[in-house]
C-alpha cells in the first residue's frame, strides 16, 4: 500500500469515526469543569509549540494547585503568540471554577495562533456539545495525479495535524488550480468551516449542491458538516443523496456507515 493511499484511508476513517460519535452516541463534554477541583489540569502536547514553551508550561502545571494560574499568566505575557499557554491557562482557570476567564483564555488561544492544535482544542472546549476537531475533507480518489489533487493531499495532511489555516490555504490553492472541479471546490468550502462561523462553509456548499447536483462529494461533505453543526435530520438526507450517487464508491460506503450510525440513535 502506498503512503498516499494510507493517508487517504486514515483521513476517511477519521471522518467516519468523528462524525459517528455525534450521530450514534452522546458526545462527551470536554469542558464540564464548572466547579473547582483538586485534580491538576492535563498537559496537552502541541507539536507547533517550541520546546522551551512546552517545558515552561509543564513546570507551571507541576506547581498545581499553588501558583499554577499565576505562572501561566506570566507565561502568557512572556509568550504572546502561544496558543498552548492560553489553552493550558484556560484549563487551569476552569479547574479552579473560573469558567468566565477560562473561556476568555481559550478565545485568546484561537486568536494568537489559529494554525495550531492548541487553538483547535480550545475551540472544542468552547463548544463542548459539538464533535471534537473540525470536519475533514474526504477525497474520492486514492492517488494524487493532478496539481489540484496534490494540493488536496497536502491539505488533508495539515488537517490530520490539526493545522486548519494551512489546510485551508492548500484547499484554496486546489480550487484555483481546478476552478470547475467539484471536489476541489468542496474541499475549499470544508476548509473554511469554523464552529464559531459555520456560515463560511455552508454558504459555499449550498451553491455547489445546485451547481453540481450529482456530485457525490458535495452531498457527502454537506452531510458531514451538518453532523458537526448538529442538524442530524438534514445530514441524513444529504448522506442518503450521496449514497444514491454511488453506493459502492468509497464515499458511498462512508455515507452508508454514517447513516447506519444514525439509525442507532
Locations of regions flagged by a protein language model:
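Start-of-helix register in tetratricopeptide repeats
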Residues: 54, 84, 117-121, 149, ...
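Alpha-helical adaptor scaffolds
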Residues: 53-66, 73, 127, 147-160, ...
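Canonical tetratricopeptide repeat
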Residues: 88, 121-125, 153, 187, ...
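Canonical positions in the second alpha-helix
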Residues: 74-75, 108-109, 140-141, 173-174, ...
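TPR-adjacent "capping" and linker segments in tetratricopeptide-repeat scaffold/adaptor proteins
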Residues: 36-52, 73-78, 132-150
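Register position in tetratricopeptide repeats
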Residues: 95, 125-132, 160-161, 194-195, ...
Amino acid at each position: 500500500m502506498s503512503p498516499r493511499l494510507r493517508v487517504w484511508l486514515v483521513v476517511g476513517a477519521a471522518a467516519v469515526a468523528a462524525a459517528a460519535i455525534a450521530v450514534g452516541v452522546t458526545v462527551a463534554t470536554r469542558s464540564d469543569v464548572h466547579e473547582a477541583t483538586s485534580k491538576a489540569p492535563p498537559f496537552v502536547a502541541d507539536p507547533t509549540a517550541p520546546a522551551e514553551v512546552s517545558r515552561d508550561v509543564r513546570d507551571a502545571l507541576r506547581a498545581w494547585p499553588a501558583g499554577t494560574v499565576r505562572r501561566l499568566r506570566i507565561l502568557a505575557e512572556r509568550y504572546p503568540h502561544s496558543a498552548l499557554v492560553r489553552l493550558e491557562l484556560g484549563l487551569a482557570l476552569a479547574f479552579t471554577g473560573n469558567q468566565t476567564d477560562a473561556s476568555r483564555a481559550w478565545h485568546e488561544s484561537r486568536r494568537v495562533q489559529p494554525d495550531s492544535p492548541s487553538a483547535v482544542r480550545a475551540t472544542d472546549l468552547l463548544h463542548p456539545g459539538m464533535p471534537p476537531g473540525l470536519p475533514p475533507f474526504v477525497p474520492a480518489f486514492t492517488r494524487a495525479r493532478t496539481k489540484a489533487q496534490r494540493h488536496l493531499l497536502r491539505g488533508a495532511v495539515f488537517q490530520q495535524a490539526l493545522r486548519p489555516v494551512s489546510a485551508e490555504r492548500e484547499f484554496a490553492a486546489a480550487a484555483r488550480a481546478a476552478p470547475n472541479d467539484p471536489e476541489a471546490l468542496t474541499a475549499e468550502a470544508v476548509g473554511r468551516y469554523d464552529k464559531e462561523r459555520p456560515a463560511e462553509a455552508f454558504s459555499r456548499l449550498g451553491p455547489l449542491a445546485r451547481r453540481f447536483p450529482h456530485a457525490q462529494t458535495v452531498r457527502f461533505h454537506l452531510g458531514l458538516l451538518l453532523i458537526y453543526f448538529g442538524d442530524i435530520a438534514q445530514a441524513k438526507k444529504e448522506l442518503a443523496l450521496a449514497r444514491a450517487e454511488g453506493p459502492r464508491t468509497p464515499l458511498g460506503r462512508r455515507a452508508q456507515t454514517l447513516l447506519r450510525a444514525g439509525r442507532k440513535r
